[in-house]
Amino acid sequence: MAKRLLVALVSTPAALIGCHSSDDGLPSDPPTTVTKVSSGGFQSPTDAVASPDGKTFYFAAWDDTKQPTLFQVSSQPGSTATPLAAGDPLEAPIGLVMSCDGATLYVADMGGEAGAILQAPAAGGAATALGATGIVRPGGIAMGPDCKSLFATGLLSDGTPALFEVPVAGGAARVVYQGAPLTSPTGLHVDSQGVAWVMDHHAQGPEGAGVLFAIPADGSTADVVASNLRMGTPGGVSLTAGGGTAVMPTRDSDGNAQLTSVDIATGTVTNLAAPDMTDPAGLRSARKAGVFAVVDSEAGTIYRAE
């Protein structure tokens, strides 16, 4: 079992404290172990998502012929990944999330001039365009608390970074928040209260570059939760299944991989060393289990944390 190290206290916005207690008795504690699940047959994975029960992982990567591909793999160690969808319209899949019923995968794809939000059946089959308009180069994607809308980070047509809401059926994207302090937002999680937790590589916070922001459902502000986060590419963030704790793949000051967790109520930050990982990137918790799917982009490996 890897050691968790208390590293800091951060200032959680007062309006958010107490709003994220455990849901339905689900686990809210940060992960304490990281275990290798799968490698081989794919390269450069970007993001992963767990099935609601945590037994199956889905991830975006490139296959051995360098085609962008969506894969499925058991969350058990030593598993072999199976391709679900490959090639067009997938170009540069960066963000991945699953519908609440586990039937559909939604993809934020930054490829081409404008990028696109795509959808694909989790059981396998071709990806298709969702038909979302008004968002350019989506990077992070998350399911909304009502399961009827998606949230995505991306750009306005003039290049302004923004957070968007998009119906799961497609259509016009609604701007939730735009502009500073957002700079290059990617990783995204939206909790049961509609608060968006956004990872931003280049944004500046009190402790340095690399910021976790909290944006309330009304889009009134983007508050710094933690900064000086040496996140992977793309940055990932997910709350525990029961809420209460935000978990992010990062690196320490020496460049060593770790999972950084922030207790939303207290601001306590802990780090879980992940010495086998090289470039921790995307991460997502199971909806109904204390399991996280984690990708190592550089090493081409999928891990589970719990």
Give the ranges of each region predicted by the language model.
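Bacterial Sec-dependent N-terminal signal peptides
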Residues: 11-36
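Residue position within the beta-strands of beta-propeller blades
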Residues: 58-60, 106-108, 151-153, 196-200, ...
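Short loop/turn segments immediately following the C-termini of beta-strands
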Residues: 62-63, 109-112, 155-157, 201-203, ...
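Bacterial N-terminal signal peptides that target proteins for export
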Residues: 1-9
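A short loop-to-beta-strand structural motif that recurs across blades of beta-propeller domains
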Residues: 68-72, 106, 115-119, 161-165, ...
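Short loop/turn segments that connect beta-strands within beta-propeller blades
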Residues: 74-79, 120-125, 167-171, 215-220, ...
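A short beta-strand motif characteristic of beta-propeller blades
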Residues: 32-40, 79-87, 126-132, 172-179, ...
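Beta-rich, blade/repeat-based domains predominating
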Residues: 41-54, 88-101, 133-147, 160, ...
